[in-house]
Amino acid sequence: MAASYGAHEIMEIHEVLTDAIDGINQFQLYRPHARDPQLLQILDRQTQFIVNEYNALVNMVQQHGAGQAVPYRAPRQFQPVYGLDHPAPAAPNTSAQQMDDRDVASGMLGCHKASALMKMVAALECGNPEIRRALQQGAVNCAEMAYEVWQYMNERGYYQVPTMKEITTNTVVNMYQPAAAPMAQPSAGETANFQ
């Protein structure tokens, strides 16, 4: 009987599924510390999405690729605020009772960033095309959820975006120029004709 999955594939899937369980548990731990109704909506929506995505991946792996990944759709977009405006000092809390909305959102953001990396690395080790696509979509979903949380944090001043002087930004951006179209290279057979 032929193997259904490669060793690397199974180990990466194991890591991704364990990470999903940990993320779901982590979000449930955060919930009592969130106070802002908007953050609670984001937390609940994302937790439900992660649970559904986890169940779909488990089913897909057990059915050897049957199923389809679903993209995460954040309900809104906004214009980011750039620059620093008296950022609050940051330090670890001395007890869990001190956790606030900023801590919850920051923890969610870190979870999504780490999961996006893990899922993309797992996709690169995956031989099964359906599971590979599901892991790739999972990485994109994490990036979308991270951006939704980041928007919330940026809007509230929890995650401010430092900027550089405009001349520095323009210098770096304009340093790169479009590439010229590559010249067609003769193939090995064509080179022999020139000799």
Summary of predicted features, one role per range:
Residues 4-11, 15-62, 124-125:
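Acidic, metal/ion-handling microdomains and their immediate structural contexts
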Residues 63-107, 162-182:
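Carboxylate-rich helix-loop segments that flank metal/cofactor sites and access channels
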Residues 37-82, 146-156:
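Conserved alpha-helical segments that form or flank metal/cofactor-binding pockets of metalloenzymes
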Residues 9-31, 85-137, 193-195:
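Acidic/histidine-rich alpha-helical segments that form the ligand environment
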Residues 18-21, 44-51, 55, 109-113, ...:
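Generic structural signal for well-ordered, non-transmembrane alpha-helical segments
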Residues 111-179:
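Preference for long, well-ordered alpha-helical segments
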Residues 179-195:
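Tryptophan-rich aromatic "cage" segments
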